[in-house]
Amino acid sequence: IQGILNGTTNYMLTKMRQEGWSYDQALQEAQRLGYAEADPFNDVSGQDAFKKLMVLSDLAFGEQPDWSEVEVIGIDTLTLDDIKAANEKGLRYRHVAEVEKNADGKIVGKVAPMLVDREHPLFPIDDVFNAVSMETNYIGTLTVTGPGAGMYPTASVMVEDYAEIIGKRAGFVVSI
């Protein structure tokens, strides 16, 4: 499983690439638009994506990797020059969270900036959108996308989660 799990960082990387904005300019605009918190540490450091990755790992594999072994690198390590150089080569930086079961059966994960080419399913995902791409046994690669930053996507997810929890307690399935 690989994914862009934080819409704020994806927005910032998109604006740095498309508009030539510095990291600070992209962050300030993300904050102004309500995509980033006043303290953006959890977003830009990769901690938010890490926590979401642990949930995905539980859903996919029924367990999580050892948290202390998951490398987490934020987007603050990237410069505008890095992004421009990648773009000139037809590549894009994405802040990717990934988890897999290795050959030994161990669950391993990582969150870090990653260069992707046009063939990668995360290549076209821009702005505040999130995406999760999964390799499946029967249908190949399955990629799901949707908005991932801002007040409405956050509120929507909270309502859906609340309805699901209440539905499970009452013994029925809620679909929103």
Indicate residue ranges for each PLM-predicted region.
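Substrate-binding/catalytic subdomain of NAD(P)-dependent oxidoreductase enzymes
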Residues: 25-124, 129-131
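Oxidoreductase and adenylate-handling cofactor-binding alpha/beta cores
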Residues: 9-21, 51-65, 161
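ATP-dependent carboxylate/acyl-activation modules
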Residues: 119-176
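Rossmann-like dinucleotide-binding core of oxidoreductases
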Residues: 1-16, 27
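A short, flexible beta-alpha/helix-coil linker loop
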Residues: 8-11, 36-37, 139-141
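Short beta-strand segments
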Residues: 2-6, 112, 135
